[in-house]
């Protein structure tokens, strides 16, 4: 049952705003519009002021659901004395990293290179020419425990600028040159070697007791999990394949049972602060939901739909995504970790919306029964609810979750049912009833801030996740929702054929454009092209293929550098270095996804230019793929497709025919590596433009062709023959 999201609070511009950020649409910038700091948005007005007054720039980058961004705002940006230092001696600029990933990634590269670590809020000091001087992340309000306080740092930078301003400008110009991406290319190792290296890395870092990889904090890094799915499929029934499936199953089940999974409100939190997947950082991101939806769905197919609990998680993520949906089909960006504990509180606390005291649950469930058992007793056992809370102090250093319980599942359904002498069916019914009661109670609490920005790249990831959920379950609700999101993109994020980066939720619930013209970035194009190809693969509509081809042409013109894809367009003079991402992290890189898109387009259209461009992507990333392939697991999967070759099914004729319908269903049931599907209804279809596909279009209908490399099997024209065809996999 779909539970409604708690009431959405949208930050809007009012006449009380103190600075220029009140004119913006970004929820993050609006959060800072009442600071006493004279904030500017990223743009020429701020840059010119810095040049005219010969002042350094203080650049602060974050996002609206960032916990430590909130902390630094409260401690420093709302402090009048600190604001005076900033206003007198600097030009202060605020950037929403989700609006401007190009700005974020450029200066984050500097911060990581100079300090050894990165994160948000990011705090960077720049010359008026936008060259970096120094930087870091969170700065405390006072000198403390060996850390310099933010006011001290401001005064130090101001003093040094007065004395050594010209020297700092020269040094900044040199730093910018060092940040220029390398353009070298070379030969790439065989994909088998690359795969073996990544697999060995995951195997050696696997936590066999708790699931996941490495030590705390643990992130649900979908890129790595997706690699293991592909690796397992490529290894057939080998011991490595079985080992990969074991690692996947342990990790995915541990995540689903742990507190990182919101058992009452659905979806997954950002990461686990400890190794047990129990206490999370409570923020929820659309890109996590979307990628994990795809991961659980692909795992469900890989394991031949054997695990009902995996299907339950697929639906659970979908339920959460429905809660963060715009009525016209888009998905909002993120939900905050922090909220007010109650309506009389003035200070937000992390996890307040999600955690429970035992007595509160007991009062809500009252004397309800499951069979002869107390519903409360069953729920307390099922979700590890303890009298003094189940949160270890080591996971809660600030005491925000004292006496609270973060729900997690430590027992199997069978164990819990046995403990209370009820059947598993009774248990499930009772737990569902309790979840509904607890959710209704949660919606009465102050809700966390919702970042209502709708980002193109994340809409693309959402579509891919939904399409894969449909393939794994064949439940049409997922496909319907994916197509609705595609319609939303066409209506609101498509600007005369090109893409916008994002749109916003207006005060009246309608979609609004931003005040600044922020064009889409390469990840917006790459992720959306992937989504369109996923839709085309599944439903066969020529319109999805045509749009994917059009966007690929635009992406190549705007972002191609000969060896991959820049983050930003060359027309943006405000960003002095065009970066190329070289690590698949919380999200994959644009080049990783684009390389696979190009190979899929080659399979469908038979144009060698796509395959050659993918090859150039691999050559451009050769050093990373050859030395640290774990950094690019998504590109490694594309490399495998390029070197091993695709398996292409060509479906010719009426898509509603019994033969083609059955073929699509069978394709949904199996996880097939490097799969491409071509749909041809007539010789006029774009997909029939290649030489071999044109010949197939002129042949018998309906028919199914299976091709690998440059060899195609004889056409299958009867359902009885499909069994033999699919037995080859």
Curated annotation (Swiss-Prot):
Gene3D superfamilies: 1.50.10.20, Glutaredoxin. Pfam families: Thioredox_DsbH (PF03190). One of its GO terms (biological process) is carbohydrate metabolic process. InterPro entries: 6-hairpin_glycosidase_sf (IPR008928), Ssp411 (IPR024705), Ssp411-like_TRX (IPR004879), Thioredoxin-like_sf (IPR036249). This is Uncharacterized protein B0495.5. It comes from Caenorhabditis elegans.
């Amino acid at each position: 049952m779909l539970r409604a999201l708690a009431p959405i609070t949208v930050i809007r511009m009012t006449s009380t705003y103190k600075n220029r950020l009140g004119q913006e649409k970004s929820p993050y910038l609006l959060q800072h519009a009442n600071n006493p700091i004279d904030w500017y948005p990223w743009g020429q007005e701020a840059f010119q002021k810095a040049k005219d007054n010969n002042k350094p720039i203080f650049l602060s980058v974050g996002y609206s659901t960032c916990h430590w961004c909130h902390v630094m705002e409260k401690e420093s940006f709302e402090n009048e004395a600190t604001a005076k230092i900033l206003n007198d001696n600097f030009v202060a600029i605020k950037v929403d990293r989700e609006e401007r990933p190009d700005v974020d990634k450029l200066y984050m590269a500097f911060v990581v290179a100079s300090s050894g670590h990165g994160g948000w809020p990011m705090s960077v000091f720049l010359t008026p020419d936008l060259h970096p001087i120094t930087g870091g992340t969170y700065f405390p309000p006072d000198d403390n425990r060996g850390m310099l306080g933010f006011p001290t740092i401001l005064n130090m930078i101001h003093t040094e600028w007065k004395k050594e301003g010209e020297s700092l400008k020269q040094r900044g110009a040199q730093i910018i040159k060092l940040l220029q991406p390398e353009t070298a290319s070379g030969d790439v190792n065989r994909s088998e070697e690359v795969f073996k290296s990544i697999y060995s890395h995951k195997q050696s870092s696997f936590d066999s007791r708790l699931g996941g990889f490495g030590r705390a904090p643990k992130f649900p890094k979908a890129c790595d999990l997706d690699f293991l799915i592909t690796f397992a499929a490529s290894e057939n029934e080998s011991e490595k394949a079985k080992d990969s499936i074991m690692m996947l199953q342990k990790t995915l089940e541990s995540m689903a049972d742990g507190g990182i999974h919101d058992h009452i409100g659905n979806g997954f939190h950002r990461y686990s602060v400890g190794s047990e997947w129990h206490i999370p950082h409570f923020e929820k991101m659309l890109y996590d939901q979307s990628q994990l939806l795809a991961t659980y769905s692909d795992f469900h197919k890989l394991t031949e739909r054997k695990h009902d609990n995996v299907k339950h998680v697929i639906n659970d993520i979908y339920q959460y995504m429905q809660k963060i949906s715009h009525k016209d089909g888009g998905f909002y960006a993120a939900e905050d970790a922090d909220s007010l504990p109650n309506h009389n509180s003035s200070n937000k606390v992390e996890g307040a919306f999600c955690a429970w005291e035992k007595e509160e649950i007991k009062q809500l469930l009252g004397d309800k029964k499951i069979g002869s058992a107390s519903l409360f007793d069953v729920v307390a056992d099922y979700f590890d609810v303890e009298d003094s809370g189940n949160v270890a102090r080591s996971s809660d250093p600030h005491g925000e979750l004292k006496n609270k319980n973060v729900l997690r599942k430590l027992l199997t359904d069978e164990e819990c049912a046995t403990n209370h002498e009820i059947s598993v069916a009774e248990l499930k019914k009772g737990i569902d009833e309790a979840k509904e009661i607890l959710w209704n109670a949660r919606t009465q609490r102050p809700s966390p801030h919702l970042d209502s920005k709708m980002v193109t790249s994340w809409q693309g990831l959402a579509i891919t996740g939904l399409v894969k959920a449909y393939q794994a379950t064949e439940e049409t609700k997922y496909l319907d929702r994916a197509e609705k999101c595609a319609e939303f993109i066409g209506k609101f994020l498509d600007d005369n054929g090109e893409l916008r980066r994002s749109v916003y939720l207006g005060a009246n619930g309608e979609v609004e454009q931003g005040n600044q013209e922020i064009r889409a970035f390469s990840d917006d194009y790459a992720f959306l092209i992937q989504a369109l190809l996923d839709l085309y693969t599944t439903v066969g509509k020529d319109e999805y293929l045509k749009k994917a081809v059009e966007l690929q042409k635009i992406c190549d013109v705007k972002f191609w550098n000969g060896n991959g894809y820049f983050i930003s367009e060359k027309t943006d003079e405000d960003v002095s270095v065009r970066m190329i991402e070289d690590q698949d992290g919380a999200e994959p890189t644009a080049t990783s996804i684009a390389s696979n898109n190009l190979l899929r387009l080659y399979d469908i259209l038979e144009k060698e230019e796509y395959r050659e461009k993918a090859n150039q992507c691999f050559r451009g990333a050769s050093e990373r793929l050859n030395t640290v392939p774990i950094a690019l697991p998504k590109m490694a999967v594309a490399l495998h497709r390029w070197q091993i070759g695709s398996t292409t099914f060509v479906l010719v004729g009426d898509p509603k025919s019994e033969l083609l319908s059955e073929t699509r269903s069978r394709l949904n049931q199996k996880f097939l590596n490097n799969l491409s599907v071509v749909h041809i209804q007539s010789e006029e279809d774009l997909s029939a433009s290649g030489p071999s596909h044109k010949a197939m279009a002129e042949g018998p209908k309906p028919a199914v062709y299976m091709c690998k490399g440059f060899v195609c099997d004889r056409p299958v024209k009867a359902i009885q023959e499909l069994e033999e065809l699919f037995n080859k996999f």
